Amino acid sequence: MPIATPEIYAEMLRRAKENSYAFPAINCTSSETVNAAIKGFADAGSDGIIQFSTGGAEFASGLGVKDMVTGAVALAKFTHTIAAKYPINVALHTDHCPKDKLDSYVRPLLAISARRVATGKDPLFGSHMWDGSAIPIDENLAIAQDLLKDAAAAKIILEVEIGVVGGEEDGVAGEINEKLYTTPKDFVKTIDALGAGEHGKYLLAATFGNVHGVYKPGNVKLRPDILAEGQKVAAAKLSQSEGSKPFDFVFHGGSGSEKSEIEEALRYGVVKMNVDTDTQYAFTRPVSGHMFTNYDGVLKVDGDVGNKKVYDPRSYLKKAEASMTERVLEACNDLRCAGKSVAAS
């Protein structure tokens, strides 16, 4: 299918929240990782989200360019082309963008989509993330208000983070402390600033102990109940009935999470879960195995000529792609979106 239109993306998220499942959002940095993600979604019979971080986009533009917007646009256009060959929907998103990179990443990408929409086309991306977790929440939400207006005009969903995700991702670091837990006051401020969709659709990355990177279970205390409290506070603020879920939540830093924690988060309105560390490992593991197994072929040892069949990048990148595809399929099963593609109904 072509990349998910704004209407299809909204329908994907609506069904996910209504039926307590979520979509894996897979960080990609290359054509190989994009191919792996899309095939994983298709093998699961699931729709999915592909996203590019600032660092991933810059990497994709190559050492001679090193420009985030160029890389993001190139990856997006590649994804548009490949996704059209598969029978599922893929939404395009950009990951964490802090304040100092807004003018060199998200805002230029919003402008590109605005120009497309003005000519009757769909936006290049379906959603963008603004990460204001490093600044005071009032400033964070003020910037979010401005971005939400521009995003809505371009038929784009905005993702906003309140609280701090611990660990580090692409240079965006968060300390592991009490700020890992979003407060009821933060949820109220978000509703006051951004509303409940009337000013434009947004996703909320509220924090409940999440940490980027790899950690052993038990080192960080995940508290999905914070999401339940956030929905309760927001519903009361909006005079909605008990049990309503005004927020569409995003689960960041989920590597190493227990299945039970994921399932609990889904019940409280998580519709998108970022997956990066686990798919990075899945991609790299067979490459390292290939190198160790074929070391005397990938290297020209003692004057020998090596073995072209094993140092041809395709020989190990195919293995990497297949392994990452399996991990994406696993994520779809964990998040209960397998077999639920909007395209199939």
Curated annotation (Swiss-Prot):
Q: Name one GO molecular function term.
A: fructose-bisphosphate aldolase activity
Q: Which cofactor does it need?
A: Zn(2+)
Q: Which domain of life is it from?
A: Bacteria
Amino acids binding D-glyceraldehyde 3-phosphate: 53
Residues binding dihydroxyacetone phosphate: 213, 253-255, 274-277
- One CC-aspect GO term: cytosol
What keywords sit in the KW lines?
Glycolysis, Lyase, Metal-binding, Zinc
This enzyme's EC code(s): 4.1.2.13
Q: Which PROSITE patterns match?
A: ALDOLASE_CLASS_II_1 (PS00602), ALDOLASE_CLASS_II_2 (PS00806)
The note on cofactor binding and number reads: Binds 2 Zn(2+) ions per subunit. One is catalytic and the other provides a structural contribution.
| Active-site residues (renumbered) | 95
Q: GO biological process annotations for this chain's record?
A: glycolytic process
Explain the purpose of this protein.
Answer: Catalyzes the aldol condensation of dihydroxyacetone phosphate (DHAP or glycerone-phosphate) with glyceraldehyde 3-phosphate (G3P) to form fructose 1,6-bisphosphate (FBP) in gluconeogenesis and the reverse reaction in glycolysis.
Which family does the entry's similarity section mention? Belongs to the class II fructose-bisphosphate aldolase family.
What name appears for this protein in its UniProt entry?
Fructose-bisphosphate aldolase
Q: Which organism is it from?
A: Mycobacterium leprae (strain TN)
Which gene name belongs to this protein?
fba
